Structure formats: C-alpha cells, structure tokens
UniProtKB/Swiss-Prot annotation:
This is Peptide chain release factor 2. The gene is prfB. It holds the Pfam family RF-1. InterPro entries: PCRF (IPR005139), Pep_chain_release_fac_I (IPR000352), Pep_chain_release_fac_I_sf (IPR045853), PrfB (IPR004374). Its main location: cytoplasm. Methylated by PrmC. Methylation increases the termination efficiency of RF2. The lineage of its organism: Bacteria, Thermotogati, Thermotogota, Thermotogae, Thermotogales. It comes from Thermotoga maritima (strain ATCC 43589 / DSM 3109 / JCM 10099 / NBRC 100826 / MSB8). SUPFAM superfamilies: Release factor.
Amino acid sequence: MGMISFETKTKIEELEKKYKDVLSVVNEDEINKELEEVEKKLTDPSVWDDQKKAREYTQKLKRLKNISEDLKRVRSLFEDLEVAIELSDEDQEMAQHVEEIVQELEGAVKKLELEIILNGKYDPNNAYLSVHPGAGGTESQDWAQMLLRMYMRWAERKGFDVEIVEFQPGEEAGIKDATILIKGEYAYGYLKHESGVHRLVRISPFDAARRRHTSFASVNVIPEIDDDVDIEIRPEDLKIETFRASGHGGQYVNKTESAVRITHLPTGIVVSCQNERSQHQNKQTALKILKAKLYQLEMEKKRREIQEIQGELKDISWGNQIRSYIFHPYTMVKDHRTGVETANVDAVMDGDIDMFIEAELVYFARRSS
C-alpha cells in the first residue's frame, strides 16, 4: 500500500467492516435459492389470479435480483481492489486506480446496506421524533432538551431538514415535550431503533449541593406516513383544543392562537402541533401524526402478539432503557443492546451518533434474519 494515502486506507478498512456486517446478515447462496423459488412461483399461471399476491412476488423478485446483482458487484470490486493494491507499490497510476475503485465501492456498499438492512416498509420515509422527560423536574427536562439538540445536530450533519412540530418549554430550563419532523431519505429507517429510554448520569447544574443525579428521557420515533394508510379516525373519538404557541422555538414557533392539541379518546394518545401558519394547517399536521401513531400502535400490537406466541416478551421498563450517557465520575456513552461505547460524550451530544445507529441497524437485522 506504499503510494496509497492514509485517508484511502482508512476508507478501505471502513468498507471492509461494512461489507462484513452485510455478510453477517445475508447469505448469497440463500438469496439466490430464494430468487429461484420466487421465479418458479411467478411461472405458475394461477398466481396471477390473486393480483395482490402476484404484486408481492413481483416486488420481492425485483428486490432479490437487486441484492444478488449488488452482492456480485461488490465482491468483484473487492477482488479488483486487492489486485490494484498489490500493483500500486510500484505504479503511481495504479494507486490512482485504487482511489477510483474505492469511490465506486463506497456507492456500491451503501446501496447494498440500504437494500439489506433498511428494507422495512416505511424505512425510506421522513420521521417524527418526540422527546419526553421522565420524573425529576428541571434536571430531566434539561436532559430532554439536550437529547433533542443531539438529534437535530445529527440531522444537520446528514443534510436532512428539521421542522419543529411542537415545543413546550420547562419552567426553569429544558423542555416538557417536543416533537420534530426530520425530512430526508431513510430518516425513519436510520432512527427507528432510537425509540426507548435514554439515561443520563451527571453532577446536576441545578443542584446547589453539586450531587450526582440520574435522569431519564424517552424518545419515540414514528414514520411520516401517506394518507392512503387504512386507519379510520372517527370525529366523535377526537377532543380538539386550541392554545397559544409558546416556547424557545425561536423562529420555528408561531405565536398566534393557532396551536392545536388533539386527544384520541379511545387510546388516550395526545398530539399537538404549533409550527404551521394557521389553525387548519396545525390541525391537519396533528391528524397526520395521530394517524401515524395509531398505525404504530396497531403494528406494535401485532408484534406483541407474535412475541407472546414465541414467548419472548421482556420486562418493558428495563428492556426499554437503551442507552446510558455518563458525564460523571467518568465519561462514557454506552448502548445496552449492541455494547457499542465511546468516551467522547461531547461529540455524541453534538450529534455524532452514527456509530450507535449503524451498530443497532446491523444488530436488529441479524436478529430478524
């Protein structure tokens, strides 16, 4: 690797790791076997009697073909890379060729990752992310705001747009409640496993005695879904209130009496929206979020039923605590599901959370494969 830059060497290591992660989730022989089975099913004329079934098989065939072709392409690029690296020691032109292969590999590996790991129905969608402080007053409310900022910074780093949908400030500091809409390709796919309880341990700036406090805040992520999702919302099930938008949302928050709060009486789900320019728009956005939440509830119910059949329902309170952020007596952010940890708390709080997100995507993909 004599003439290859340090930056390129680092990229090659990263790509090898990502490729290894992909191969831990998917088996090329199994993909090809599945591909043959689906092709065989589609040659049976009777399958076309059921249009819905036929469409499902056609979509599956397309996805499997893409994965199969991309696995071959990535494998062949890695083989080319190996040869080019060997020859690059003596040949400057070949070192340049290594750079070109690495660039091509980056795109190919990313495409493969998205096809295999981000393959959920709503993964490509925008995401609504809500943060709610746990018990503990100002300390928890401040922690909730720190988390909200972390996700907003992460979204900015990704080049995603962020809209504040709801922002209720705390009495002294922090937030009582906040919801943001993160707009970008695969926003929901990346963030879906961030739902859960996040725990903070630090010396509280709000405690005159400078004692160590443990605070909790819960994060909930749901996809922005299209209006064609079949969820019935009956007007008589809704309690709709208007209030004046308030908060430290700065330029994001509208100050007129146009904020809307909707309570879905059968489930007790409460949704607020205050950032749109009119009461009507706020109501439409709130209804859209409510629809997504009801859909999520329905999916969760089905998932629970399956889990109960499989007998693997865990203790929700502990099982839901997904990550700890320790500021004192040492610094450490640790994900309890994947085991990924870092001592660089400042970078994490500034939105550098891709290491956690990527690890959890692989972790859950392995579990479901």
